């Protein structure tokens, strides 16, 4: 309609809207409601990236799109991108994280270990089973900053009963330049 066309023309990110529409069209879920969802979303660029990743992997469905809208767009994009880069983005893995109560920290952990070259299905499952997500994220962050995030150090951190002291010791070493 003329109204939809004008919405795209006046949108602050029209290219993101057009690409999102294309992904919807290609997967058969282009509806007025979905258009309104992306048009009104506060992060259209991240939504476009999420839709692109889901479309590339054959996972762009109405249900997955709706679950993405319930998440922070930057966190879900970071999560999907990390898994996609190492070819472990599957519907099962998406569902595991989609329902995780701490998507923000999980997505950051995945980004750290993906950038370190140690994101595997096994390591992904270890991260999901971890109870102390925030201390794990901090420990991995400090290891990454020090250039010490390796598979061996990742396993050492995971094997500790108390991760918080590990994170603190890494922070103190980093602050002291040691």
PLM region spans:
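Ankyrin repeat (ANK) tandem alpha-helical domains that serve as protein-protein interaction scaffolds
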Residues: 1-178
């Amino acid at each position: 309609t003329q109204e939809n066309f004008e919405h795209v023309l006046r949108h602050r990110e029209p290219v993101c809207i057009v690409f999102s529409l294309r992904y919807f069209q290609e997967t058969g879920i282009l509806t007025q409601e979905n258009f309104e969802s992306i048009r009104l979303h506060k992060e259209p660029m991240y939504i476009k990236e999420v839709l692109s990743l889901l479309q590339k992997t054959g996972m762009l469905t109405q249900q997955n799109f709706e679950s993405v809208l319930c998440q922070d767009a930057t966190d879900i994009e970071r999560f999907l991108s990390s898994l996609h880069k190492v070819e472990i983005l599957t519907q099962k893995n998406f569902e595991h994280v989609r329902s995780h109560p701490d998507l923000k920290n999980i997505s950051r952990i995945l980004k750290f270990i993906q950038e370190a070259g140690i994101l595997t299905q096994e390591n992904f499952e270890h991260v999901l089973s971890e109870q102390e997500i925030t201390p794990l994220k901090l420990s991995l962050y400090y290891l990454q900053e020090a250039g010490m995030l390796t598979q061996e150090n990742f396993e050492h951190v995971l094997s500790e009963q108390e991760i918080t002291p590990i994170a603190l010791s890494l922070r103190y070493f980093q602050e002291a330049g040691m």
